């Protein structure tokens, strides 16, 4: 029995060799069914022959009998778990059948078991890239030499470009695409792909040259769009190119997408008015698409075509009402001066999307703009109940309090908004403005927050200014001069950063004057008055300094300027109106970003 057992493997291999050779010959000639018959017959006699079973799995795969192929390959792995050929073949099957996660797992095992066989590592890298696992794909490709075959080499460079692009390395991506293009320099697909890579790199000239080769030869609309993007990126004249694109023949099934993309490129580069005709054409071609009408309305609104914008928005609403379109209609009605209709639209937006802060903020801001502060406060308090940790809602609540004269309450709420915000700068900016405008002693918690932020962001001139100025106000009232050096340092840094802003110089003049350092106060006060000729306070302060230093004639001249500026001086309501404008712009921008 032992002798038979010892002879058996040798006999099996001898018997298997002719069967495997015949099956391989059949596969070589494309006869996968013939190979399947030969191998199946052989495995009836030798069911444990893993080589035959592996070949059978491959034959099934070539014949398109995927389930049978997977079954046979799994049987091979039961017998030989580290058979890298079977692992790779299974990985390829999973990839072809849309199961990239399973494919990746098999190819990872195959690469390890096959001692980093180049072909397997390359296939593994491809699957990793398709899974957007670019760092791992880059590692799989590391050290691999480009294939000798030209077609495979092009695919290799394109893969490396894709991985580099996925990692945000546009320079390397463009370089790899240029290598691929060099192997087939007249290929339209490679020209366009390389142009797209150069666009990502912002190499506008090279991108335009490559795409224009294809566009000139073929009038391919996609090539034309790449030329347009490159021209817009380089701030070139697009009028002639736009005319060519508008006259380009586009397949009917692709025209809507073409017009939409053309409009998107124009809008993204500030050519809003030019985008309107493209969006109109797209909306005509697809009249049932509410999104196209919405985009058209938004472009018309930005271009100041308010009647057209309202008409397009109403058509979009008739197709599909949404909070987004109601919010846009509210913006349009506000711009048209119909605040009652604007309020109704904003209320409709809130009703359609009660959990989205953007629409509640839009409604509250509309009410605030027309002095409906109590109503705005109710809207924001309702929003606060559902979203207590929304810093934007807290910012708006704080500003409502400020606009109604409750500066202390406003500051407290804005401090809370700053604590909630991922970046507190917006809330702290308004907090600083409120504190700077007060005649009372600055709030110590507010000053602490502003100064901490300025310490963490030393290049933020506005925060350095506010911190220095507020520290001075605190110390001046308390008769404390221990922070003078810090205050002066902050204000000088602010003056350097905010080169065109008179405020740091005005504040420095106040500090030096309070310390009787008149000769140092003078140049700062002169700069302050020269840079802000309408500031009554600046002229009055400079007049006092001139008098103190004995320049009576100059003092009298400054007093005359002070009297004229006093008559023109903005009152508290005007200052609040200016703050309102800044707030409305900021909060709408922030609310919009929260929805994106």
Tell me what each language-model feature is.
Residues 16, 50-51, 84-85, 118-119, ...:
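Helix-start (N-cap) detector for alpha-helical repeat units in TPR-like alpha-solenoids
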Residues 45, 79, 113-114, 147-149, ...:
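Structural marker of alpha-solenoid helical repeat scaffolds
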Residues 24, 58, 92, 126, ...:
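Residue-level recognition of tetratricopeptide repeat
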Residues 41-42, 75-76, 109-110, 143-146, ...:
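Canonical positions in the second alpha-helix
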């Amino acid at each position: 029995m032992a002798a038979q057992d010892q002879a058996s493997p040798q006999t099996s291999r001898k018997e298997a060799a002719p069967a495997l050779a015949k099956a391989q010959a059949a596969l070589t000639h494309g006869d996968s069914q013939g190979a399947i018959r030969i191998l199946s017959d052989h495995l009836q006699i030798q069911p444990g022959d893993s080589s035959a079973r592996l070949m059978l799995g491959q034959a099934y795969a070539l014949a398109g009998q995927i389930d049978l192929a997977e079954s046979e390959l799994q049987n091979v792995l039961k017998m030989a778990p580290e058979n890298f050929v079977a692992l790779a073949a299974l990985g390829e099957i999973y990839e072809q059948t849309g199961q990239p996660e399973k494919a990746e797992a098999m190819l990872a095992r195959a690469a390890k078991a096959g001692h980093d066989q180049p072909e397997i590592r390359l296939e593994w890298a491809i699957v990793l890239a398709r899974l957007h696992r670019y760092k791992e794909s880059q590692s799989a490709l590391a050290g691999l030499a480009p294939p000798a075959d030209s077609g495979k080499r092009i695919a290799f460079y394109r893969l490396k470009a894709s991985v580099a692009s996925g990692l945000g390395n546009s320079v390397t991506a463009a370089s790899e695409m240029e290598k691929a293009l060099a192997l087939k320099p007249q290929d339209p697909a490679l020209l366009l792909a390389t142009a797209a890579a150069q666009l990502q790199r912002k190499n506008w000239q090279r991108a335009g040259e490559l795409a224009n080769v294809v566009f000139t030869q073929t009038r391919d609309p996609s090539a034309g769009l790449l030329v347009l993007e490159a021209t817009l990126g380089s701030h070139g004249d697009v009028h002639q190119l736009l005319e060519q694109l508008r006259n380009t023949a586009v397949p009917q099934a692709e025209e809507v997408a073409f017009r939409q993309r053309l409009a998107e490129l124009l809008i993204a580069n500030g050519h809003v008015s030019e985008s309107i005709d493209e969006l109109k054409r797209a909306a005509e071609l697809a009249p049932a698409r509410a999104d196209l009408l919405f985009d058209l309305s938004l472009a018309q609104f930005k271009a100041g075509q308010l009647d057209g914008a309202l008409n397009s928005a109403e058509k979009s609403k008739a197709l599909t009402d949404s909070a987004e379109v109601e919010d846009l209609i509210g913006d349009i009605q506000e711009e048209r001066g119909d605040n009652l209709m604007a309020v109704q639209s904003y209320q409709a937006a809130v009703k359609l999307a009660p959990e989205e802060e953007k629409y509640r903020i839009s409604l509250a801001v509309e009410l605030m703009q027309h002095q409906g502060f109590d109503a705005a406060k109710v809207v924001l308090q309702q929003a606060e109940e559902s979203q207590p940790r929304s810093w934007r809602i807290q910012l708006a609540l704080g500003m409502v309090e400020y606009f109604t004269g409750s500066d202390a309450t406003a500051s407290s709420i804005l401090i809370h908004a700053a604590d909630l915000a991922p970046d507190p700068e917006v809330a702290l900016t308004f907090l600083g403005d409120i504190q700077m405008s007060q005649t009372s002693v600055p709030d110590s918690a507010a000053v602490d927050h502003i100064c901490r932020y300025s310490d963490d962001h030393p290049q933020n001139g506005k925060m350095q200014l506010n911190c220095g100025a507020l520290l001075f106000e605190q110390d001046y009232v308390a008769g404390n001069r221990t922070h003078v050096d810090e205050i002066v340092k902050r204000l000088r840094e602010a003056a350097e950063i905010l080169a065109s802003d008179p405020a740091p110089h005005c504040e420095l003049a106040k500090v030096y004057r309070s310390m009787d350092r008149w000769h140092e106060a003078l140049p700062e006060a002169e700069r302050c008055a020269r840079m802000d000729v309408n500031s009554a306070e600046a002229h009055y302060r400079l007049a006092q300094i001139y008098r103190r230093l004995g320049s009576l004639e100059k003092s009298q001249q400054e007093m005359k300027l002070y009297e004229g500026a006093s008559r023109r001086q903005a009152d508290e309501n005007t200052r609040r109106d200016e703050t309102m404008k800044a707030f409305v712009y900021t909060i709408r921008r922030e609310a919009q970003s929260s929805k994106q």
